[in-house]
Structures are given as structure tokens and as C-alpha cells.
Amino acid sequence: MSITATQVNELRKATGAGLMDCKKALTETGGDHEQAVDYLRKKGLAAASKKAGRAATEGLVGSYIHAGGKIGVLVEVNCETDFVAKNEGFQNFVKDVAMHIAAASPLYVRREEVDPSVLEREKEIYRAKAKESGKPDNIVEKIIEGQVNKFYGDICLLEQAFVKDPDKTVQTYLNETIATIGENISIRRFAKFNLGEGLEKKESDFAAEVAAAAGA
């Protein structure tokens, strides 16, 4: 069967996978969206799943400073051995992830960390909007599912499109690094700092400053 560009784009939005991977997944599954999602998940996690159960207690705390010192990121990435922690490929991965966080501002590492009450509130908003369209309940639920996946893709680090290569997600980049290095790797936590965030900026009185400087 013929796979349309719309199908490919919808699958890409739902999974964050590359265009060619999405097209192949749809071709392999006869154009079935849900089966194609499962296909991509199995394919994307294949290399990582064999190592996912191994303890990753070594690693690095990486940092990235941007925009003249006004934005900073710390990220902890774990691996299995100190040897890999010193590996250039691993260190580059940590640096890339820190840079991505600075640019994309995720709120969580993975979807399991999202507060259920936050997710439920989003679903209610999506449901209310979808019902206004007058579509059947089964279609409404599919719309909600797609919007929830987009919501995760916006706020969860692993599901975001990787800033240096938007055709793949951070999860895909992580899986590729695991496959290359041969050890389990896990992004544990991160913090992003914006200079002055949360502080009330004092509005200066320019005329008063000039008068004071002139000794008035």
C-alpha cells in the first residue's frame, strides 16, 4: 500500500523518530499507526533493552554555560564503569545533553516523572476541546492520546527532538550511545538556571541617577 506524507508526519510527531524510520515502520506494518509506534519502540530500544537492567552507578555531572553566563545547566549522567566515564564519546554525550537542556528547557527526564494530577488536568483540557468538534468518543480518545504524546514530547527530556539533530529524539541518541559504548547509560537528573529567574528586577530612575551623579 501507499504511505502518505501525512501518515509519516503524524507518526513522527507521536514518536519523535526520523522520517525514514517512520516511513519504514508504516511500510512494515501496513500503514497501521499504532503498530508502527510499537515497531519503532521495539527498534529504538532494542540495543538499550539488553543493558537496561545493569546497574549504572558511575558517570559524570556535566555542565553547560550559555549566553554570557546568563543560562547554566547541570546534568547527571550515569554509566556502569569509571572507564566509560572517561570515554570521549560518553563525555561528548553528556555535553550534548547539557547543551540540549539549555536550549529546549525540559521539565522532566522521562514521562514517568510527570505528576499524575498535571497530566489529568491536561487531558481534561484536550478532552473538552476535542468534544467541541462533535467527533465520536473513540476518535476523541485518539485525539487526546496524540496530544498527550505531544505534551510529553514538549516537557520530557528523553522524548524531545534532539536540538543538534531534530530527526531523532534524545532517547534515540541515548540508545545509539549505549549501542556504541556497550554499557548501560542513564540520564538521572538535571537542573537549569536562568540568571535573575524569580527575582523582581528593580526599575531604575534614570533621571535620578543622572542627578545624583551630577551632585544635585
From Swiss-Prot:
Keywords: Cytoplasm, Elongation factor, Protein biosynthesis. It comes from the Bacteria. GO terms for molecular function: translation elongation factor activity. Its main location: cytoplasm. GO terms for cellular component: cytoplasm. It is found in: Cytoplasm. Residues 81-84 are annotated as: Involved in Mg(2+) ion dislocation from EF-Tu. Belongs to the EF-Ts family. HAMAP family: EF_Ts. Associates with the EF-Tu.GDP complex and induces the exchange of GDP to GTP. It remains bound to the aminoacyl-tRNA.EF-Tu.GTP complex up to the GTP hydrolysis stage on the ribosome. This is Elongation factor Ts. The lineage of its organism: Bacteria, Pseudomonadati, Thermodesulfobacteriota, Desulfuromonadia, Geobacterales.
